[in-house]
């Protein structure tokens, strides 16, 4: 899982750099640019620190996928709405799927989707300029999360079946080797 953590950190770094550059290009060097970029960079620092802490892989994975997602919502709120920023959450959903663990997807998608619904009532611009657009984005995110969860669940089941079949083959190989050894001794 360590390799997935590191790969996801690189994705976060690339996203922070990209969003910082596009923020400066969009808003110039203003107060909201500094605040927005500050949230992004603070999130990167938090995620990097957690990577080196002695905590479970599950906790690391949750911090790696949830912190950037919440940071994007905060960022969007600080720059007074950014309809493109929400799309970055599809990247964090993909990062959650890379762990190939339905538990991580579930514990990521449910609270984040609920937070997005709350954002609709705080400031719809955090998600999208229009209420209908925000609803659409949240529904698409939730549907994607459900489909990816179900796909991962199916994949986990097939992996367990393949492992069981491999174990059976290894047992059969051991029996065949013992029989061959005994026949050769006679």
Where are these regions (language model features)?
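A helix-boundary/kink motif common to multi-pass secondary transporters
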Residues: 56, 100-101
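Membrane-water interface at transmembrane helix exits
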Residues: 51, 76, 123, 152-156, ...
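Short, Lys/Arg-rich, polar N-terminal cytosolic tail immediately upstream
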Residues: 1-2
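Short hydrophobic alpha-helical segments that form membrane-spanning helices or hydrophobic packing faces
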Residues: 107-111
């Amino acid at each position: 899982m360590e390799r997935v953590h590191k790969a996801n950190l690189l994705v976060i770094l690339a996203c922070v750099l990209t969003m910082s550059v596009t923020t400066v290009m969009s808003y110039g060097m203003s107060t909201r640019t500094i605040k927005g970029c500050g949230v992004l960079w603070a999130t990167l620092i938090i995620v990097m620190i957690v990577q080196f802490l002695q905590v479970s892989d599950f906790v690391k994975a949750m911090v790696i996928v949830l912190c950037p997602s919440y940071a994007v919502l905060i960022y969007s709120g600080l720059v007074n709405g950014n309809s493109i920023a929400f799309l970055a959450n599809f990247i964090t959903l993909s990062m959650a799927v890379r762990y190939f663990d339905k538990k991580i997807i579930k514990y990521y998608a449910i609270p984040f989707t609920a937070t997005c619904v709350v954002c609709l009532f705080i400031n719809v611009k955090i998600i999208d300029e229009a209420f209908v657009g925000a609803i659409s984005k949240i529904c698409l995110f939730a549907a994607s999360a459900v489909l990816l969860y179900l796909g991962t669940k199916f994949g986990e089941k097939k992996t367990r079946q393949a492992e069981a079949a491999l174990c059976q083959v290894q047992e059969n190989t051991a029996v065949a080797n013992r029989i061959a050894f005994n026949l050769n001794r006679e």
